[in-house]
Amino acid sequence: MIKEIFLGEKMDKIVKHPSVLDGKNPNELRGDSITNDRYFCKDFMDKEWNHMWTKVWLIAGREVQIEEPGDYIVHDLVKESVIIVRQKDGSLRGFYNSCAHRGQRLVECDSSQDSFRCPYHDWQFGLNGDVISVPDEDDYPQGSPVGKRKLVEVRVDTWDGFIFYTM
């Protein structure tokens, strides 16, 4: 059956005639030129950011880069930074590289550690993104943030050894 699909008549039916061309001549689909402003125009960059980059799966790295619990990679894209970290159960989780307290960047480069510590106010986050300690925990008038606050998570998945995330 598979051989027929790729080598026989069924293949012709699958790829011979695209179903939607919006009335365009297929010979003219790539005829328009791309203007230089696509590469340096802020308005175009903003449109790409709002309508594409925040809605697609992005490659963060390879699974072999973070094999042990606590291993993590940092992926920066324009104004965002994401941490992908190997969990103790072997799964992967991703978080914005930004403290849940005041937004300070947590880590600068790929490494391995048991937790993430904010360099600004010293909040500590577990590998699962939960706040696990803060200085002077009893001094918070609204109550301790430990166990209540966490890093903002991004969706992570893998395919064939590649690590992907989406915002």
Question: What do the PLM-derived regions correspond to, one by one?
Answer:
Residues 52-54, 69:
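A short, polar/charged loop/turn motif at coil->beta-strand junctions and beta-hairpin connectors
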Residues 65-166:
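Rieske [2Fe-2S] iron-sulfur-binding domain
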Residues 59-63:
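Short amphipathic
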